[in-house]
């Protein structure tokens, strides 16, 4: 009703963009006839106009004025290089992003292409633009694919990947537009603020950032801080003993009247993800370990037991982690991907290693940390894209000051969302999923089944294998995860069945009939890899190919040939019938000749896998090239794609007529948004498609957040195990449960943000001080400033202004000054007699400056420049050591203030107040320690040093 009275605010916002879209369309006629060189020259012209404006504040209004012309130039470059023309709605999406908002654009509407518009415009300032994706694969794909547009227009494009060296990172961050993952950006920021030398710093000042899948990064991952850790030795046997004790303890089956079952040793709260020992549990655990008190500070055990119980009950193998090569590797709960190198903190990872009988790695201590919330707020301008932002609109606005605009689709949606089906048991649900998958598969339609864990995906895989239904598996298991792109490339083929763990945020569209462009590139890779790639580098994951005898459309799966570690041989071919047809003899022969020519040009097995893939990616571009080998490679890709296209187009028509992609959800996620992301895989760009969710009373959402009501209804109506319930009331009940969970997690994220905001202000102050030191500007002035403040603090500690001067303890004051500055050993108390408090401070500051000049003379005689090096070393050493200790102290404070809520005190206010006092004390200690270290610094003379060495 309110919308009817006041009008739709989103519609009003979009209406404002329409005249600008008209301007861009008019410019298209003017720009279309330009030569490639003339089009590129526009970039130089734009830059000259911006440079003439001067400061960034003056450039911003000019950027808005340049927008229509710049967007028209990018549209034309997209047509020439990618063969893709930005639709009008994509222009609107680009404007939303340029204004620093979130653009909600449905799956398949070309979000990746939209990002080229504001990226190009804001990169013209020369201050750098970051385009952020959720994983290395997508960052690489977008840098190669969309980077073509920017490179064509004369901008430099950088890419940050996990295995890059600092030197490579610095070069790539120095580019006009840099593609990177959220975690790499965050960790590089933290590492830069731990650097010992300015040359180790890789990032430059932040300016503009566009985040793809913004809800995944700013909402889903906001609860987890980025942490850089150092190792701390803890007794391994404690983890092993705790795991043994946890296995001997029994879980409370039901909650008693007081919240605890008297017959259980511990209770588990799945909602809070915590475990608590009962009184009986404490007694039993102490007896099993042979100690009198689990909380004895000299021999603490409680923390180890709590972590062991959580590892036993809340961290499930093949759901939360997988075991690979003797290590427990975390599985991302939102994307289903493994996260090698990441570890749970606070001893939790060690508890899981003990549970699984793995080698226990040393525990870690936090050296630096930041939440994604505070990291991305460092950007002066922040924007994001996603298919599902509206459900989190309030949080985006409150936490990040980001407004959300819903960009209309280019074509009307034709997808059908069928009603949820709820079963009493999980067994019945999985049978129903397998049955519907088989039925839709027989119709010749592709099916995508979304599961929530590796374990569930393998359960369904086994059920489908029993029915002889060919399928592909995409989950966190190493043999599957590396083949993600090619599995998705064929997920739209007629009759294909793909089981995927958490498709949310995977960033790859499923194209009906299959992706002929990717198939052609993979075919070239398969042919060239054995001839061009060094054998030792040829360790890419399995991609075995079995060619369909029919050589036509349709999907046939075959078991992959296994290599020595369960992986397929690395000549790398594609699982199942990836290629839609056999190539003609003429094309096959042309590929053989191409391989020979490239061996001559690039050497026999002389490239790395990445180098080969880079060259294939470059050849797949449409941008002009003067490299004869790349041109040859490009012609071969076009020849192969042409043959595949003929079959793929025909297959696409058949899939459309059959009803398009059918998406099956096997569990409601805690967030409605993630469910919508899965649904959004079907019906892209007006394609036909359908979706349905299959649920059971055993699903986590219903079990933890309110399944009793539904179970009561089913029992009341005596519903059979294999009979589903479909009802509006049930759907509303489920959505109500999801809203409860969303609110619960929003409160957690809000609390994380509020507490980290305290740390954030302190972090900014410390990192600003550190950067001053790294930049090396006025180091002496900085240290003397520390000394002057230290003198003031000594005076304030030993002089009481309320007492007459003759009662001041000047002797103690002088002794304390000499402790810090031994060069003032001749200072006598009578020199301070008769001075006021302010005069005392001024006198001691003057004495300190004189002493520091003397010290500098001593040190510089040994080697010019040594004093500045010492200043830099001691300041950085003290900042890093004390900041590390401060982080530990703040963690301990945060845990302890939680209990103060029982004393009618606000824990957050207590945390802020005490944290501030602790921070001031840390900074004071840092200044004092630097002054003490500088005056005590006595390097050996060069001659003495040489004699010692000899």
UniProtKB/Swiss-Prot annotation:
GO BP field: intracellular protein transmembrane transport; protein import; protein targeting; protein transport by the Sec complex
Catalytic activity, EC: 7.4.2.8
Membrane topology note: Peripheral membrane protein
GO cellular component: cell envelope Sec protein transport complex; cytosol; plasma membrane-derived thylakoid membrane
InterPro entries to which the protein is assigned, alphabetical: Helicase_ATP-bd, P-loop_NTPase, SecA, SecA_CS, SecA_DEAD, SecA_motor_DEAD, SecA_preprotein_X-link_dom, SecA_SF2_C
Reactions catalysed: ATP + H2O + cellular proteinSide 1 = ADP + phosphate + cellular proteinSide 2
Main location group: membrane
Keywords: ATP-binding, Cell inner membrane, Cell membrane, Cytoplasm, Membrane, Nucleotide-binding, Protein transport, Thylakoid, Translocase, Translocation, Transport
SUPFAM superfamilies: Helical scaffold and wing domains of SecA, P-loop containing nucleoside triphosphate hydrolases, Pre-protein crosslinking domain of SecA
UniProt binding sites for ATP: 90, 108-112, 509
GO molecular function annotation: ATP binding; protein-exporting ATPase activity
Record PROSITE patterns: SECA (PS01312), SECA_MOTOR_DEAD (PS51196)
Membrane spanning residue stretches: none
Region span, Disordered: 257-277, 535-568
Subcellular location: Cell inner membrane; Cellular thylakoid membrane; Cytoplasm
Assembly notes: Monomer and homodimer. Part of the essential Sec protein translocation apparatus which comprises SecA, SecYEG and auxiliary proteins SecDF. Other proteins may also be involved.
Homology family: Belongs to the SecA family.
Function: Part of the Sec protein translocase complex. Interacts with the SecYEG preprotein conducting channel. Has a central role in coupling the hydrolysis of ATP to the transfer of proteins into and across the cell membrane, serving as an ATP-driven molecular motor driving the stepwise translocation of polypeptide chains across the membrane.
Protein name per its UniProtKB record: Protein translocase subunit SecA
Gene that this sequence comes from: secA
